[in-house]
Amino acid sequence: MKVLSALCVLLVSVATAKQQLSELQYRNAFTNWMIAHQRHYSSEEFNGRFNIFKANMDYINEWNTKGSETVLGLNVFADITNEEYRATYLGTPFDASSLEMTPSEKVFGGVQANSVDWRAKGAVTPIKNQGECGGCWSFSATGATEGAQYIANGDSDLTSVSEQQLIDCSGSYGNNGCEGGLMTLAFEYIINNGGIDTESSYPFTANTEKCKYNPSNIGAELSSYVNVTSGSESDLAAKVTQGPTSVAIDASQPSFQFYSSGIYNEPACSSTQLDHGVLAVGFGSGSSGSQSQSAGSQSQSSNNNWSESSQSQDSNSWSQSSQSQSSQDSNSWSQSSQSQGSNSFTGAGTGSGSGSVSGSGSASGSSSFSGSSNGGNSNSGDYPTDGNYWIVKNSWGLDWGINGYILMSKDKDNQCGIATMASIPQAIPKSKWN
């Protein structure tokens, strides 16, 4: 399983856009990908998914030969179209062009740093996974709340708080549970509610349920939040210097769908049509960005296992979903593998995955690929970068992007709208709780 996972990424790294792959090469790559992701198809569905996989593989190969700082790979989304990806994993784009981001009364002080990484400071909890619930907004809000509480406590006592409480209990503020919501509305709920429970006491279920808030299990209390000046990356940097900050982005492009490593640079992104809530935990610049997982974040020895499947239908802003199974892997770029089966189509392997393209059957085929990668997927998490970047925490599990993170372009005209609708909360020190 580990070999097969690295294999798929290797193949797209060594192929060139001008190389015409044979049908057998496509088929072998697809077979290996199916095994790595435990994909199962009916015989009727196989050909359709195979053709989509080939088109996506061609897109990835062509992109990776352009010399972009963004590296793409055959991840969990390799057998679905971009239309399916957007309909299933992202919400209806929220038009933020006329949105009035009114700051709350509290204003933070401080000076903007040249670079910051709140993971290294211990203010970021491990990567989480929203599963089949369109609750990215709640994960973004809890991430910012967790960081704010840690900082308010004097850089101590990092506590994971409950996304499920926000999903179940903040409906009266305008949020729609697993159907979507806004981070600012989540902050308002936490402030007025007098706190939010710990994740351990109110665990995530990936469904909208009856509110079960218990004030005896509070893990964080907020006093206020501040909105970033819409569109201002310099103001966003000033806020991120103060702590992890909730941001909304356009994640609809195929390049985001297949993101693997490097700085994400996509001029086609919209700065106003936003469909995904994430967390900015830092920023940096230079020719070599070291993004190793340090204290406050969950480490993993591989960035490209991509063992993940999901299914959801969301229709509101900031809603999208996915489900992943995290695993540890080794990044060897010279691997070979063989898969065997008979009569029908499957990716045989341990465990199981259910999703929008699941079915049944088995597959046969064998392949052996070897080569070297210059895409920058090293075990230490060091990725070639060229320019300024935001360090962004996603909620699609460890098997997406760089151990669950993405480096997004910074100071490129608010690319993907990262500064259009951003906000940061301020917490009450635990010593001052009632």
From Swiss-Prot:
**Residue positions with a glycan:** 227, 305
- Choose any GO biological process term that the UniProt entry carries and state it: positive regulation of apoptotic signaling pathway
Query: Pfam family example for this protein?
Result: Peptidase_C1
Q: List the disulfide bonds.
A: 133-178, 169-211, 269-416
Q: What is its main location?
A: other
Location of this chain's protein in the cell? Lysosome
The active site is formed by 136, 276, 394
Q: Which GO terms describe its molecular function?
A: cysteine-type endopeptidase activity
The EC number(s) given in the record are 3.4.22.-
Chain positions covered by the region annotation Disordered: 285-384
Q: Which SUPFAM superfamilies match?
A: Cysteine proteinases
* N-terminal signal peptide: 1-19
Q: Which UniProt keywords apply?
A: Disulfide bond, Glycoprotein, Hydrolase, Lysosome, Phosphoprotein, Protease, Signal, Thiol protease, Zymogen
Excised during maturation, the propeptide residues are: 20-113
| Gene Ontology CC: one annotated term | lysosome
Where is this chain compositionally biased, Low complexity type?
Answer: 288-347, 359-381
Q: Does the UniProt entry include the keyword Kinase?
A: no
The cross-references to SMART domains, in alphabetical order and at most eight, read: Inhibitor_I29, Pept_C1
Compositional bias (Gly residues) spans? 348-358
Please give the PANTHER family that the UniProt record associates with this protein.
CYSTEINE PROTEASE FAMILY C1-RELATED
* Family the entry assigns: Belongs to the peptidase C1 family.
Identify this protein by name: Cysteine proteinase 6
